[in-house]
A protein has these predicted regions:
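Amide-forming acyltransferase catalytic core, primarily the GNAT-like/NAT-type
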Residues: 119-211, 218-231, 262-263, 272-286
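Conserved GNAT acetyl-CoA-binding A-motif
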Residues: 84, 89-103, 233-243
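Hydrophobic pocket-lining residues that define ligand/cofactor binding sites across diverse proteins
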Residues: 74, 91-92, 228
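Short amphipathic alpha-helix that is part of the acyltransferase structural core
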Residues: 1-50, 57-64, 130-170, 204-208
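Conserved acetyl-CoA pyrophosphate-binding loop and the N-cap/start of the following alpha-helix
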Residues: 74-86, 219-223
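A short, internal acetyl-CoA/4′-phosphopantetheine-binding micro-motif in the GNAT/acyltransferase core
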Residues: 65-75, 207-218
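Conserved beta-hairpin
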Residues: 28-44, 183-202, 350
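Active-site/acyl-donor-binding loops of N-acyltransferases
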Residues: 113-133, 211-377
């Protein structure tokens, strides 16, 4: 699919053109066309934007699926499934072993081998519930959106945070695309003038809206909440997003706040062998050799049994005789290795077929951190 195709046959709304063309120009876009009156008409498309993602300390090249659409009159014909298979194959050929997306239908994508890997939490805190008596040694300074320290701080955060995407220039453009002009950025600096955390926020109608709040250490976390408290005379409540998958209510003296959680990103391992070659496990774990019987109806190269040797924090495919056997779908395998669910929990849910001893030993080997995914492309 070319830019001309999109301009002439697809995206006719000027606002959509403006918002999506920067992404689509840099994405790998596949489309399905129909011939109507001797003219090609784009009826479906599947776009993948390349990004890097931290998966347990390893920087993976991944594909971010975006701008998936089919005209209503062409749904139900398997077009999107064919485009997805072709697109995932192209990702595999370019050495990308993992993809993620934000689903418009979780059941639909689950049926195609995708599974939930992260959460988004939202919270509402009354002004009287904002933490007080915080006296951190650093200070907070507001900066411009294009401040280099702000962007470098996120890169530092991504390098130490499982699941976080590394933002390139386009990702930053998308991050601020729909924000109001009054949106502000505040950075927390420690006593040595080193940036250690930031928050992106907007104050409107007596409400502080926090788009993102990240920190490299506890000091920065508390320092930013101290900054929030400094606004208590200007606001009635704080509304924010939390991608850490850890409720914040327990942190507050008055924990009676409104907090909601919902699934956010879905992921998919495109190529088991490629993914495992980069994957890290717990170096302090007991190690062991496991066979995984994987079922993948969409991508045939993932169908089969993979024997993986976990040793010293690394994983390798091997011909050794396995000590334990597990069977699962590619979606379950994805959510397990990304840390969203433990093997024991998946066994209880009937998603894994194995002995309890096998899943207990596997859980001792794997890391268990839910991915931090906050970006939308």
């Amino acid at each position: 699919v070319t830019e001309a195709d999109l301009a002439e046959t697809g995206w006719k709304d000027d606002e959509i053109k403006q918002s999506k063309f920067p992404v689509l120009e840099r994405a790998d876009v596949l489309g399905c066309f129909n011939i109507i009156d001797n003219k090609e008409e784009l009826v479906a498309q599947f776009a993948v934007y390349p990004l890097d993602m931290n998966i347990y300390g390893e920087r993976y090249e991944v594909g971010f699926v975006t701008s998936v659409c089919t005209y209503p009159e062409y749904t139900g014909h398997g077009i999107m499934k064919k485009l997805m298979r072709k697109s995932l194959t192209r990702m595999r050929d370019s050495n990308k072993s993992f993809a993620l997306l934000y689903p418009y239908s979780i059941p639909l994508y689950r049926g195609l081998g995708w599974e939930i890997i992260s959460n988004k939490m939202t919270y509402v805190i009354k002004d009287r519930q904002i933490p007080t008596k915080l006296k951190e040694p650093g200070y907070v300074r507001r900066v411009q959106w294009d401040d280099e320290q702000f962007k470098k701080l996120h890169t530092h955060f991504a390098a130490k945070t499982h699941g976080c995407l590394y933002r390139n220039n386009l990702a930053w453009e998308e991050y601020f695309r729909w924000d109001e002009d009054d949106t502000m950025v505040a950075i927390y600096y420690n006593e040595d003038d080193e940036p250690c955390g930031y928050m992106v926020y907007l104050i409107s109608s007596d409400v502080m809206h926090i788009k993102e709040l990240i920190y490299l250490n506890r000091e920065a976390q508390l320092g930013l909440w101290e900054y929030i408290h400094a606004h208590d005379s200007m606001i009635d409540e704080v509304r924010g997003n939390n991608y850490y998958s850890e409720p914040i209510a327990f942190e507050l003296d008055d924990s009676d706040i409104k907090e909601t959680i919902r699934p956010y990103a879905m992921g998919r391992i495109i190529d088991v062998a490629q993914f495992i070659s980069q994957y890290n496990c717990d170096p302090d774990g007991p190690g062991g050799c496991f066979s995984f019987e994987i079922e993948d109806e969409l991508l045939p190269w993932n169908n089969g049994t993979f024997v993986i040797d976990f040793e010293g924090g690394h994983c390798t495919l091997t011909d050794k005789k396995p000590q334990h056997h597990l069977s699962m779908s590619i979606g379950t395998f994805t959510t397990l290795l990304l840390g969203y669910k433990s093997a024991e929990k998946l066994l209880q849910m009937g998603k894994i077929q194995a002995t309890y001893d096998a899943v207990a030993k596997l859980d001792d080997i794997l890391y268990h951190e839910i991915p931090y995914v906050s970006d939308y492309i």
